Amino acid sequence: MKNNNAFTLLELMIVIVIMGLLATIVMPGIMNRPEQARRTKAIVEIRQIESALALFKTDVGRYPTTSEGLAALVSNPGVKNYNQDAYLDKLPTDPWGNPYIYICPPIKGKYYDLKSLGKDSEEGGTEDNSDIESWNNEI
C-alpha cells in the first residue's frame, strides 16, 4: 500500500480557487472599514459637541446663535455665566477635515442643526457620501 500524505495538484487547485472566492467575498467588507470608522468618529464627535452645547445652554440659558457658531464653545462670545473650562478646547473639524455645520435656530432639528457633510463634502449624498446629521436616527 502506498501512503499518500501529500496533496495532489487537483486538491491544491481546488483549495486555491476556494480561497480566491472567499477573498472576493471578504475583501470589499474589509476595504470599506476605514470609511465606516470615519463615519463612526463623526457620530461620536457630534455627540460630544451636543454635550458641550447642552452645558452652554445650562450655563448661559440658550444655545449659541448661528452667527456665534461652534466658536462659542471655545471662546466667550460676550455672554454672562460663560464657563471657559466646561465646553471645548478647540474648534472641531469632521474626520474629512471640514468644519461641522451648526445652525440655530434650526431648520430640521429640534433645538439646532448640527451636521457633517460626509466624505464628499457636499449636501446630501448616499451611503459613504451621505451627511451625518444630529437629528437623524443614525446618531
Task: Locate predicted features.
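N-terminal single-pass transmembrane signal-anchor helix
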Residues: 2-30
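A residue-level signal for beta-strand positions that form part of recognition/binding surfaces
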Residues: 6, 85, 111
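Generic leucine side-chain signal with a strong bias for well-ordered alpha-helical environments
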Residues: 9-12, 21-22, 53, 73, ...
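Non-catalytic, surface-exposed connector residues within folded enzymatic/regulatory domains
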Residues: 24, 40, 64-67, 82, ...
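Conserved hydrophobic/amphipathic alpha-helical signal-anchor segments
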Residues: 33-75
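Short, surface-exposed interaction loops/tails
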Residues: 36-39, 54, 71, 95-139
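Extracellular/periplasmic head regions of type IV pilus-like filament subunits
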Residues: 58-108
